[in-house]
């Protein structure tokens, strides 16, 4: 399995024959790739944590071009259907639910402490034969992250650290304590001035309270598991 970061909260996870795109705001200022580059990757599924512009992003355009179904809350899938995505090309679910994508990959939807234009914000646990990844979406710190750790053995946690709209470095470091992943990657920072952060601050905070390995990825980098 490998995970590539496109900046902000946008990632693509590859496992077996599946290419799972997450929160594809590919036109974000940090992205090292073009929208056409991502379409050419031919993602098999598109996961969207909520419908804010910086997470729904280019999902509709990519889905129309590739046929990849959009996975999200029921309300989010209704929203994208209103914008031209066929209902058959959506996979609605809700917090606490699970869907199977094939190749031994399962998607679990978790809560997130945030807002959305329609429906509820969410996170995703992506369980593959090679490992398990938790994409927190946009969220504040919440105590039930401990339950996520009890339910799923997380290999990699992708956590926002930008503050203002999500956790900052201090809160995200505590989230690492609650989630107990083997590795953590900070995201959702330095895309625009309001969420400017020093990722080294997050790294030092995590290392002061845990043995979790912190990977400071640059947009375009790939992490292999």
UniProtKB/Swiss-Prot annotation:
SMART domains: Lactamase_B. InterPro entries: Metallo-B-lactamas, RibonucZ/Hydroxyglut_hydro, UPF0173, UPF0173_UPF0282_UlaG_hydrolase. Keywords: Hydrolase. The keyword Hydrolase applies. One of its GO terms (molecular function) is hydrolase activity. Gene3D superfamilies: Ribonuclease Z/Hydroxyacylglutathione hydrolase-like. It comes from the Archaea. SUPFAM superfamilies: Metallo-hydrolase/oxidoreductase. Belongs to the UPF0173 family. This is UPF0173 metal-dependent hydrolase Pisl_0803. It comes from Pyrobaculum islandicum (strain DSM 4184 / JCM 9189 / GEO3). The lineage of its organism: Archaea, Thermoproteota, Thermoprotei, Thermoproteales, Thermoproteaceae.
